[in-house]
Design a protein with these regions (language model features):
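Conserved N-terminal beta1-alpha1 strand-loop-helix module at the mouth
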Residues: 1-207
Length: 207
């Protein structure tokens, strides 16, 4: 099955639209002021207070203890972590805060993909482009080196026209943000169209 995580959400109406049209996860960027999608803690608390059955994801780069402590009482089911943390540190974060972990790896080569083996504690491995928010992609065929029992997420300039091809590689979660924006703001029409396309692909696969 193809699932979708919509990342970089910053307004209640956008979260509501994601919930309405079937996103599996809603992502919120924290402690990363370089990004126009970065949220204050107050805003993150507001956006994650909505009652729904989807998963809220705190997206962070190399979070420190103080930052992790500051969000421990917010309604997050997953922490998505970028950076070069030791696998033991990832395991400690998971146990201490009782959350599921999405470990992000930046991908350029096969060797980058194989780094997933280090992070046994991660619930999901995110394979992202080296550009992070710079709208770059990577060769998705590299994911053939990852066993099917590893739960996978893919990011990096994913467009609506890419969904059919990605869905044929394997069951996967697509992590999308910039493709659903107009002038650096989430576009409700683009969110709707993207999520309806995901739904269409899944329905066609069951026929």
């Amino acid at each position: 099955m193809l699932l979708a995580k919509i990342c970089g959400l910053s307004e209640i109406v956008h979260v509501e639209k994601c919930i309405e049209y079937g996103a599996s996860m809603c992502g919120f960027i924290l402690f990363y002021p370089k990004s126009h999608r970065n949220l204050s803690l107050d805003k993150a608390k507001e956006l994650t207070s909505l009652k729904h059955s989807k998963s809220n994801v705190a997206v962070m780069v190399q979070p420190n203890k103080s930052q992790l402590e500051s969000i421990k009482n917010l309604n997050f089911q997953y922490y998505q972590i970028y950076g070069d943390q030791d696998p033991d540190e990832i395991n400690k974060i998971k146990k201490r805060y009782r959350v599921k972990i999405i470990k992000a790896l930046t991908i350029e080569t096969r060797e980058d993909v194989l780094k997933y083996k280090k992070y046994e504690a991660a619930d999901i491995i995110l394979f992202d482009s080296i550009g992070k928010e710079k709208s770059l992609s990577f060769d998705h065929s590299l994911l053939k080196y990852v066993p099917t029992n590893i739960k996978k997420m893919v990011a990096g300039n994913i467009q609506i026209q890419d969904l059919e091809k990605i869905s044929k590689i394997m069951d996967i979660i697509v992590d999308v943000s910039g493709a659903l924006e107009t002038e650096k703001k989430k576009d409700l029409t683009k969110i709707k169209e993207f999520l309806l396309k995901v739904k269409e692909i899944n329905e066609n696969r069951t026929i």
